[in-house]
Each structure stands twice: as structure tokens, then as C-alpha cells.
Amino acid sequence: MCYGYGCGCGSFCRLGYGCGYEGCRYGCGHRGCGDGCCCPSCYRRYRFTGFY
């Protein structure tokens, strides 16, 4: 998932949970958290910082 702590290139991104996973896309689109590392496409689309 790409929200909360995992939003800033954190543990989830390093463990391999990329934007292809449903949790990561959910975090970018619905939580307003665009992670430039885990979800680059979502980050460019929503223009949110979301780095924790």
C-alpha cells in the first residue's frame, strides 16, 4: 500500500510493492498521496508531494 509511512519511498516501496499493486494505486488516487518513487505515474497526475 502506498499511504502513510510507505508513501515516501519507504518500506513498502523497497519491499517491491510498486504502482502495479492495487494498494499503491489506491494510495495515490484516493488518499491524495503521490509517491514519486513507488507511484511515479500517480505522482505526475495528481501533483501531490506525499513524501513522509
Curated annotation (Swiss-Prot):
Task: Identify the GO cellular component terms for this protein.
Answer: cytosol; intermediate filament
Q: Please give the InterPro entries that the UniProt record associates with this protein.
A: KRTAP_type8/19/20/21/22 (IPR021743)
Job of this protein: In the hair cortex, hair keratin intermediate filaments are embedded in an interfilamentous matrix, consisting of hair keratin-associated proteins (KRTAP), which are essential for the formation of a rigid and resistant hair shaft through their extensive disulfide bond cross-linking with abundant cysteine residues of hair keratins. The matrix proteins include the high-sulfur and high-glycine-tyrosine keratins.
Q: Which family does it belong to?
A: Belongs to the KRTAP type 19 family.
Q: Which UniProt keywords apply?
A: Keratin, Repeat
Name the encoding gene, please: KRTAP19-2
Report quaternary structure and partners: Interacts with hair keratins.
Q: Which organism is it from?
A: Homo sapiens (Human)
The signal sequence is none
Say which domain of life the source belongs to: Eukaryota
Q: What is this protein called?
A: Keratin-associated protein 19-2
